[in-house]
Regions:
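Feature captures the catalytic ectodomains and active-site-proximal regions of enzymes
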Residues: 1-213
Length: 213
């Protein structure tokens, strides 16, 4: 199933869990040797990854990227094994209706399982080129005009920049959060005369010097 950016979804029907699958962003600038899938079906998954190179390396898209001086997407990398969690509907638990804004399908899926409304926003990418203000405006519209009690805005840009070791764009992303997300929300709610609570909570650090969590 096609997702966004480098995150896509492989569904293995009747598969087993317990594999050792290395997240690619944990081994930036490191060798992949010794980090291929391990476990009951590890050899099968590793073979899929190796065979994908044969299919993708000479693909017209990759030939064009190489010609343009870009890195080719010449293989798949399997990681992030999991099963569908059983989450309770938050609105039924607390009587509060919520929404979620994100470009990351994993986060979107968690919101759906928790009974949150998915708020689609044009121009969001999950990276530093996302529409920061568009996210804030969509959240404010949903809260002020569409009956929602809370909205979770997921912004992945600083994390992605950290994984790339891109300090300049990480700083830029944080500045955009401050200047275009928080500032927009404050203005919208204050102009509407509404009481509001804003919670800003990072879930982990991603230092540019180590490119991982």
């Amino acid at each position: 199933y096609a997702g966004n950016s480098y995150r896509h979804c492989l569904v293995v029907s009747g598969g087993v869990t317990g594999h050792d699958l290395t997240p690619p962003h944990d081994i930036s600038d490191k060798s992949v040797y010794g980090r291929l899938p391990k476990g009951e079906n590890g050899e099968f998954y590793a073979d899929l990854m190796k065979r994908s190179f044969t299919l993708l390396n000479d693909h017209p898209v990759n030939l064009k990227r190489v010609k343009e001086g870009k890195k080719p997407a010449n293989s798949i990398w399997l990681w992030g094994e999991g099963t569908k969690p059983a989450l309770e509907d938050f609105s039924k638990m607390r009587g509060l209706k919520g929404g979620i804004i994100t470009a990351v399908d994993l986060v979107k899926g968690i919101g759906m399982l928790a009974g949150m409304r998915i708020l689609d926003v044009d121009g969001i990418t999950g990276n530093y080129d996302t529409d920061f203000k568009g996210k804030a405006e969509a959240a404010a519209d949903a809260l002020l005009n569409d009956g929602l009690d809370y909205v979770y805005i997921h912004i992945d840009a600083p994390d992605e920049c950290g994984h790339r070791g891109d300090c300049a764009h990480k700083v830029y992303s944080i500045e955009q959060i401050d200047g275009k997300v928080l500032k927009t929300l404050f203005k919208r709610f204050e102009n509407a005369g509404e009481d509001f609570t804003l919670l800003v909570c990072p879930d982990h650090s991603t230092p540019c010097d180590i490119k991982t969590h």
